[in-house]
Amino acid sequence: MRFNREPFDANVYSRPKTELLKPFVFFITASILILQGCDIINPKEKEPAYLYIPSFTFQANLNQGTSSEAITEVWVYADDQSLGVFDLPAKIPILDLGTSNIRIFAGIKNNGISNTRIRYPFYAPFDTTLTISAFQIDTLIPHFSYYNLAVISEKGFESGNFFVQTGSNNGSFSVTNQADQVFEGNRSGWGHIDTGLSHLLYKDDENLFYQSGNNVFLEMNYSSNNIFSVGFITTTGGITSKNVALIINPSSSGDGLSPVWKKIYIDFGYVLQQNPTAQFHELYIESIPANSSTPVNIFLDNLKWVTW
């Protein structure tokens, strides 16, 4: 029996060691490139620092009326870059380390509506500079106040009632000094519709000042057991008209004689823009009972007209 043998090729068995290692070297190189590529695609995350804001303070100057406020959140910026809007207390991550200029604005519910939150234009921001390091937690309690340029006119009821009856209605508006019905100080305003009666409409007959095109807000402390509206009675060429700015929901229940006080910021800018030629703007409040068997009780205090 004969076996056929292939001719012996010495070159196959005498390759240099470097050629034998080529596949292994290629594998290692490819692996390194893949790992480096992962670092490029998914770079190592920065280690953040944190800004902790547990609360805030607010104070109006002596000539700016009450320090009552309804600030609901803070708008936070680092070097003019927004970090977000936060309810308090808040722990806020900061990725850009080093020296940072922190600016914090006070936010409110415009017209008392949760879905229309804004930076209140008349509250000055809180500013500070921090040197920020990774894992560091800096605690800030921002202090807010009105801008000095804000033009503020406040009316309370310490000196008596300034609302007068207008039109045909059978409600009443007076002043209460009963301690458990007064918001602050010694007196608050009290609107009342007795059982079986149907309508309250009262106005402040002082013309309210504002500059066209500027922000215009009415701040107010209130308690009510019935829906009521706030707006302007305008006079143009001897013709008067009633312009609703906001319809306000009840804050209390039952007969409303135990007030549940709230603070609201009412944006009057839009209403005023609809009446650019009016000579007079008089603030009014109005209410119609939802239930004729339940008396209506509306308590007001610190009506603050704020503009520039």
What are these regions (language model features)?
Residues 34-37:
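C-terminal motif of bacterial Sec signal peptides marking the signal peptidase cleavage site
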Residues 78, 96-115:
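A short, solvent-exposed beta-strand micro-motif common in secreted/extracellular proteins
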Residues 139-171, 298-304:
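Extracellular carbohydrate-recognition regions
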Residues 173-200:
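Short carbohydrate-recognition loop motifs
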Residues 220, 263-298, 303:
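Extracellular beta-strand ligand-recognition surfaces/modules
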Residues 110-141:
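Structured interaction patches on ligand/partner-binding surfaces of diverse proteins
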Residues 217, 221-269:
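Extracellular ligand-binding interfaces
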Residues 157-158, 204-228, 266, 303:
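Extra-cytoplasmic beta-strand recognition segments
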